[in-house]
Swiss-Prot record:
Name the record gives this protein: Putative protein N-methyltransferase FAM86B1
Keyword Lipid metabolism part of the UniProt annotation: no
Entry GO MF terms: methyltransferase activity; protein-lysine N-methyltransferase activity
EC class (word): transferase
Organism: Homo sapiens
GO aspect biological process, one term: methylation
UniProt similarity note: Belongs to the class I-like SAM-binding methyltransferase superfamily. EEF2KMT family.
Pfam families, per database record: FAM86 (PF14904), Methyltransf_16 (PF10294)
Its EC number(s): 2.1.1.-
GO cellular component, one term: protein-containing complex
Binding positions (S-adenosyl-L-methionine): 139, 165-167, 228, 247
InterPro entries linked: FAM86_N (IPR029426), Methyltransf_16 (IPR019410), SAM-dependent_MTases_sf (IPR029063)
Record keywords, A-Z: Methyltransferase, S-adenosyl-L-methionine, Transferase
Amino acid sequence: MAPEENAGTELLLQGFERRFLAVRTLRSFPWQSLEAKLRDSSDSELLRDILQKTVRHPVCVKHPPSVKYAWCFLSELIKKHEAVHTEPLDKLYEVLTETLMAKESTQGHRSYLLSSGGSVTLSKSTAIISHGTTGLVTWDAALYLAEWAIENPAAFINRTVLELGSGAGLTGLAICKMCRPRAYIFSDPHSRVLEQLRGNVLLNGLSLEADITGNLDSPRVTVAQLDWDVAMVHQLSAFQPDVVIAADVLYCPEAIVSLVGVLQRLAACREHKRAPEVYVAFTVRNPETCQLFTTELGRDGIRWEAEAHHDQKLFPYGEHLEMAMLNLTL
């Protein structure tokens, strides 16, 4: 195989691997590239390699996605194979049969591969939005912020980090594993989200602060219930963060006002210390929402600067989405 062709195959396999483990929508997979390669070769080795990178991946075997998702993926893979090959590939049908026989769970897993060779795995409800909260969903801006953090570890090394609206915990878990913070505080207002957050922290080999058996080389990890509208200075003063982060929390005008308010109170808690650095990442869905955010910041005397887009694309998320991140000075 020519070097260029080999590189193309590796990229294709990586595309399937990262999307499948992260349980991305099937339409986001590089199916056209796969079909083109299958037409150029009568060999089924590529399909076997895809199985090894997806349903047979060690991370997937340990932390599988929902049975329904795996079944839909394999069905689509079989369709692509049958469209260009007359001979069936027994291995595909064997794996599909195994999947159909597996017991479905109310929890599925999404895994994200890290540049260190490790991974972050989230155990999540198989429902897209559960119990009236979107906090159980991993939004694309959380992936974008995690990528930026991994590329800029100096912002977090040996520092106390407070995350507002942690949701499923992807960003914080990636920072804890890759950026060596001294302490990390996950926060969210919803009790069901907090319950799942605690589970995800433990699932990824981290210990919560009350666990005296925890790894001393790991950051001190806390999961805190924090409602921006009711949190007073005395509660916030316990956190004393050096860095505050948030991802995809600008979903309505009320949330923007609440966010700016809690940031102001966090700054007031630092007394004679320097105010925390703040990074807010979001998907630009509505320019008016972004404008409202910067207007509210200006009204409260908070300066902001847009962070340059980072280079690495480590996690799979919408390729055509516009992402932004602001660095705020309180």
